[in-house]
Amino acid sequence: SKEQFCNDVYCNENEIEEMIKGGMVIGGHTHSHRVLSRLSSKEQFVELQRSADYLKNRYSINEPIFSFPYGHIDTYNNKTLEHLHELNYHSAFNTVRGATCIIKSGKYELQRYDTVDLYPH
């Protein structure tokens, strides 16, 4: 079932708390995993705010990092980046392959390598 699949694949709140206690950093990914560039500015703000509020209220994370849903540069826009700043997000990662460099990309468009990118083919 879909519920069983989600229980098997995704972390529950207890597992997240254990990860935080172990020193891992937990960040936001929006509230409902929608493509942000398809939303109005207000809808984007609400998505990002609900995610930030959840992290703050549930895990006391006041300056979360963010990972864009779907990650491609066409799935967010300049309004998204402005809202991340307004809501005090620490930084944000997209799925553009590359080493993280704040000077090159700015703190709200950090590149990264996905684990799939590093797997030998």
What spans do the regions from the language model cover?
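Active-site beta->alpha N-cap acidic-glycine motif
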Residues: 1-22, 35, 57
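Glycine-rich, flexible loop/turn motifs
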Residues: 7, 32, 106-109
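Residue-level signal for threonine
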Residues: 12, 32, 77
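Structured helix-beta-strand junction loops
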Residues: 22-23, 87
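Histidine-centered catalytic micro-motifs
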Residues: 25-33
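C-terminal active-site subregion of NodB/CE4 polysaccharide deacetylases
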Residues: 38-121
